[in-house]
């Protein structure tokens, strides 16, 4: 502490002793957030999150296939979850051609699973267990009325649900688990992680405007956009996604929209979007303190959204 005080005193003395001719103006690196999520380098957009859009679409089609009682098999659902480029696993040709899949990004964040491969493998296996159980427990009993101890269907007058012997809907368990183990985990614990944003020479390259080979964006810009894509990747207009928030997918986007519809949380969609565009603007401005402040906001608000929806489902039974 004495050393710190001494150092501070000497520094202050040096400032006082310097001639005013030598004083340098303090440059404030302020960040102005744009009105929309639009970022350009010259005349070209620097925003890219195609991989996230692809995985959201894959997730939606795979979850829907859980209810395709006429065509789905254990093999077909497993193939959708662990898609290999060129295989005809989906109805969309672009998804079939993609080298992306869901399994590789399940429980795969840097912060939580980089050194914890055994837990990652166990979580991946849970998804495969849901597939096995849906085919082998629920499918044979779709015409049976479910009762405690017996899988089958529950009709409540508005829709029919298909459950296991304990009342669990495997299709919902699969979809909601994707929301957590892929979308939220990749966003919050991977692409917004300082270990990923600042990996290697990312800061230096961003400071110097060095883009990835044959791309318009720096690596740091792209990592931020990939986090953004897990929430807004299928938005009708990704530059102004809150115009349709809650309508663009059945995962995080829907969750944020539903929570935002609650008068008690009516600003949460705006707060999340504002933090995303402010953080991206901070990266462009090379202001990493502001960037990290926005990461904290996004993590808090997305976690709050998931908690609110969890309570809603628990209260609904």
Annotate each language-model stretch with its function.
Residues 2-8:
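Sec-dependent signal peptide recognition
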Residues 14-17:
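C-terminal motif of bacterial Sec signal peptides marking the signal peptidase cleavage site
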Residues 19-22:
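Bacterial signal peptide processing site
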Residues 24-317:
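Mature extracytoplasmic or organellar-lumen-exposed domains after removal of signal/transit peptides
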